Amino acid sequence: MPELPEVETVKRGLAPSMEGRRLTRLELRRTDLRFPLPVDFAARTQGRLIVSLSRRAKYLLIDLDDGVSIVSHLGMSGSYRIEAANETGLPGQFHMARSRDEKHDHVIFHLSGPEGDPLRVIYNDPRRFGFMDMVERRHMDRHAAFAGLGPEPVGNALDADYLAFRFKGKAQPLKTALLDQKVIAGLGNIYVCEALWRAHLSPETPARALVNAEGKPVAALEDLTQAIRTVIAEAIEAGGSSLRDHIQADGSLGYFQHSFNVYDREGEACRTPGCTGTVERMTQAGRSTFHCPQCQR
C-alpha cells in the first residue's frame, strides 16, 4: 500500500496540471470503490476551481475553492494519469498516454484551464481498495481518516522529545509503536524497517527502552528520529518505491526500492559496513519485518 513518499510523489506529479483549473465535470463510472462514493459527488464538485493539491499522511487532498477537499486514498492499486487533447500544451511534465487497463478507470476529472483548454485526470484502480470522500477543510480533524493523526515525519513537528513522550512506559515493540498512525502519520512498514536498520535498533526493542528515567530521549532515540526523517526525505526525492502496483502520475515508477537496505532482502548480506550478518524476515502484528539481527540490537 502506498506510504507517505508515494502519495507525495503523486501529489507533486498532479499539481502542475490540476491547480488553477476548473472541474467542469466529475465522471463516475461506478458508485463505489472500497466504500460508496459521496452522495451527489459529481453535482457538489461541478464548476469548482481547484486551488491546490495537498497531502495529509497517506491521503491526497484536492482542495476546492468552496472550502471543501476531495480526499483520495490510493489503496493497493490506485493510480492517476493525465490526458490532454493537445499533448504539447500539457502543463507540467507528468503524462501517461494509456492506462494499463482502461476498464478500471473509475473516476475521471474533466478540467478546463484559463483558456478553456480541456484536460482529463483519470483515477484507475483494478482492486478498488482505494476510496474517495469529501471533507470541509475547517473540520478535517473530525473526519474519521484524520482524527487523532500524529505529526508527520517531515517538517519540524517530529523530534526525539515528542517520541520520548509517546514511548514512555510503552512495552510495545519499537516497530509496532512506530506504525501507530497516532504516533507518526504516514509512516508505513517499508520505511520503518529502513529507519530501524539505519539507527541499528532491533524492531523488537520495547519502545520504553529509548526513554530514560526522567522521560527524556536516549541517544538511540535521537538517532532513530533522524533516520526516520532522512529515509522519508530520500524516498520522496527518489519518487517513492515501486512495489506491487504503485505508479507515479507520469506512468513511471519510483526508484527508492533500489536503495532498500533491508526491506524485501531476506537472506541477503547486511549492508552495514563491517557487519557479517544476513537480513532476516519475521512477522510482527501480521506484517513482515526485515532486519539484521547482528547489527540491530
UniProtKB/Swiss-Prot annotation:
PROSITE patterns: FPG_CAT (PS51068), ZF_FPG_2 (PS51066). Keywords: DNA damage, DNA repair, DNA-binding, Glycosidase, Hydrolase, Lyase, Metal-binding, Multifunctional enzyme, Zinc, Zinc-finger. Its EC number is 3.2.2.23, 4.2.99.18. It comes from the Bacteria. Binds 1 zinc ion per subunit. Its cofactor is Zn(2+). It catalyses: Hydrolysis of DNA containing ring-opened 7-methylguanine residues, releasing 2,6-diamino-4-hydroxy-5-(N-methyl)formamidopyrimidine; 2'-deoxyribonucleotide-(2'-deoxyribose 5'-phosphate)-2'-deoxyribonucleotide-DNA = a 3'-end 2'-deoxyribonucleotide-(2,3-dehydro-2,3-deoxyribose 5'-phosphate)-DNA + a 5'-end 5'-phospho-2'-deoxyribonucleoside-DNA + H(+). A zinc finger (FPG-type) spans 261-297. One of its GO terms (biological process) is base-excision repair. SMART domains: Fapy_DNA_glyco (SM00898), H2TH (SM01232). GO terms for molecular function: 8-oxo-7,8-dihydroguanine DNA N-glycosylase activity; class I DNA-(apurinic or apyrimidinic site) endonuclease activity; damaged DNA binding; zinc ion binding. The active site is at residues 2-3, 58, 287. DNA binds at residues 104, 127, 170. Belongs to the FPG family. Involved in base excision repair of DNA damaged by oxidation or by mutagenic agents. Acts as a DNA glycosylase that recognizes and removes damaged bases. Has a preference for oxidized purines, such as 7,8-dihydro-8-oxoguanine (8-oxoG). Has AP (apurinic/apyrimidinic) lyase activity and introduces nicks in the DNA strand. Cleaves the DNA backbone by beta-delta elimination to generate a single-strand break at the site of the removed base with both 3'- and 5'-phosphates. Monomer. This is Formamidopyrimidine-DNA glycosylase. It comes from Allorhizobium ampelinum (strain ATCC BAA-846 / DSM 112012 / S4).
